[in-house]
């Protein structure tokens, strides 16, 4: 039995998208609002292939759609959790919970480390912005008088694993790096 075309604004789960690029199920949502820019997708994909490798346009568009679907899938699960808990804001912990629930357990630990470092940086930048009263400034790890940039610990130190085609996180002194 053939699947009926999606009607605008109708049916399907909250993470389902309509027809890929035909304008069918998206209602009034423009393609540029549904997808990440193709240039960004292409740049990320090129990091996973040899320098002389090429990527076909349809491959880029397919990954572009998959990324959009993945984001919707994870966000929908996190949103359901927040609704059950009567909260309106989805946070990083909700997204990690959703990823674990949906079978992406292998990504949780590296993302927890990244989220912690991100929060430390954000907290430090807020502290720095608010401490114009002359109080002692601390870095994200609580060191007095240190630079206010904790970004050094978050920089990527490597490329994607050429053989596997995806990032393989490795930990070095608490830093996140890719091999």
UniProtKB/Swiss-Prot annotation:
A Pfam match is CBFD_NFYB_HMF
Q: What does this protein do?
A: Component of the NF-Y/HAP transcription factor complex. The NF-Y complex stimulates the transcription of various genes by recognizing and binding to a CCAAT motif in promoters.
Lineage of origin: Eukaryota, Viridiplantae, Streptophyta, Embryophyta, Tracheophyta
According to its UniProt entry, the protein's GO biological process terms are: regulation of transcription by RNA polymerase II
Residue ranges annotated as coiled coil are none
Descriptive protein name = Nuclear transcription factor Y subunit B
Keywords attached to this Swiss-Prot or TrEMBL record, sorted alphabetically, are:
Activator, DNA-binding, Nucleus, Transcription, Transcription regulation
* Stretches for region Subunit association domain (SAD): 63-74
Q: Which gene encodes it?
A: NFY2
**Composition bias type Gly residues, residue spans:** 8-28
């Amino acid at each position: 039995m053939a699947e009926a075309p999606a009607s605008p604004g109708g049916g399907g789960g909250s993470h389902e998208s309509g027809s890929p690029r035909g304008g069918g199920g998206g209602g009034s949502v423009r393609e540029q609002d549904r997808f990440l820019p193709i240039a960004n997708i292409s740049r990320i994909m090129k990091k996973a292939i040899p320098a002389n490798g090429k990527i076909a346009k349809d491959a880029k568009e397919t990954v572009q759609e998959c990324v959009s679907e993945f984001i919707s899938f994870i966000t929908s699960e996190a949103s359901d959790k927040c609704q059950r808990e009567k909260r309106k804001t989805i946070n990083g912990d909700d997204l990690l919970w959703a990823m674990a629930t949906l079978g992406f357990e292998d990504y949780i630990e590296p993302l927890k480390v990244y989220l912690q470092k991100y929060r430390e940086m954000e907290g430090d930048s807020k502290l720095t912005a608010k401490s114009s009263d002359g109080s002692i400034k601390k870095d994200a790890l609580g060191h007095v008088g240190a630079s206010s940039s904790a970004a050094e610990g978050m920089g990527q130190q490597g490329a994607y694993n050429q053989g596997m085609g995806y990032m393989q996180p490795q930990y070095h002194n608490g830093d996140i790096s890719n091999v």
